[in-house]
Amino acid sequence: MRVSIPPELVSSLGACDLRVTVRGEGIDKYPGGPGAAKQHARKVAMKLGVSSGLIYLVGKPTINWGDSDQPQPFRQRRYFYYLSGADEPDCYLTYDINNDLLVLYVPDFDLHRAIWMGPTLTTDEAERRFDVDKVRYYASLQSDIQSWVGKYNDAAPVYILHSSQQPQFSVQQLHIDDQRLLPAMDAARVVKDDYELRMIRHANKISGLAHRKVLEQIHKMSNEAQIEGLFLDTCVSHGAKNQAYEIIAGSGPNAATLHYVKNNEPLKGRQLVCLDAGAEWECYASDVTRTFPLAADWPSSHARDVYQIVEEMQEQCIKRIKPGVRFRDLQVLAHDIAIRGLQKLGVLKPGTVEEIRVSGASAIFFPHGLGHHVGLEVHDVSEKPITGMGLPNRPCRPDFIPAMSQSVPLLEEGMVVTIEPGVYFSKLALANSRKLPQARYINFDEAEKYIPIGGVRIEDDILVTRTGYENLTTAPKGDEMLEIIRRGIDN
């Protein structure tokens, strides 16, 4: 629609300061926009189950390295980002639940910093960029909180994540709740909204391009460091300057080290590379692993056979993803497939699948969980881990499978989880397992033949949809992966 404005009115508008306020039920400044922060704040309040109170969050401060004047790389606290969308240091945030008012506090203007580092974030710029109701400078934070406390704190608490993050000002008797906000935010973050899914998809898109580029160029490389370098270069070239986690580029026996990050050994004489690397986009992670040969085809039957076992583990688990599924059952399925495959190879001795699984023998070769949530953290938060075991009991022990809780949350629409089975032949793990009861199920002479391949892991990020799943990961694998390597060699 076009509106005609008389010329005399146009000339008079130049001296006017016009501001338009749009009011209406359910209208947000940026519906589903940058960070979808206001939507997230309301969701957290709903998970808290309260209609009043003040959520108070402290962003990541600027911190120098020890004994240095150089700042550490900045990484915003993820709970803060979830409610602000602000990837800037030294910020604070409040959300007045009763008045539905989300306020971001940015650092006061610092002339010295502006001269040395460039323009600093202003309130006007922040209001344009972030999905918050109001932006104020830090100088206003103390008086604003004191005003809220004077009006409401007798009846409603100030919610904080940790006791160390209380508002720092001269009020002696604050009504503080440092117990309920963290689980409420975990519950809110576990199911992703459309904005978050767009970010995770884009992170996966860039990761897919980087994995593909490595496959195309792998025949030219002579060291693990070159793999890491090319992956990083591709991500940065596509706008993703940060990785969701340290790149793992383990060749040969190094592939059996789950979190191998040295990435500095020569590739000569090695059979496989396990590349676990994922870009980050707007603070949202991708988590992708591919294992591929350093040749146009599988260099040995051992490498091919182990890859096919892991490939089947992943395919069978992914096809069962849907709402209502218990992730623990998929973990058990993956172990059962691994056991049958390793028995065919002669690595595991005869016995029922169940008795071998319960003994923990398969966990010698598959010692980690099948997957985890993905979001603002690569190992994203939830009220209760989908495997039934929390961070203090990471799944690295042989008794992981029998110890897993039967009472675990079911998969829900909107969750994003990894499916990352693996089979590894760790010289250290095999030597240690000789002393364990489950050693009776392992043919060590046969298992040690596989040590040169290291291990195989394949990992994709899977969205739980209303009727099933969507694979968000675009990195090539299987036959497509091999074809890309061959084309690279031919060219």
UniProtKB/Swiss-Prot annotation:
SUPFAM superfamilies: Creatinase/aminopeptidase, Creatinase/prolidase N-terminal domain. It holds the Pfam family Peptidase_M24. Transmembrane segments: none annotated. It comes from the Eukaryota. Signal peptide: none annotated. Coiled coil: none annotated. The keyword Metal-binding applies. This is Probable Xaa-Pro aminopeptidase An01g13040.
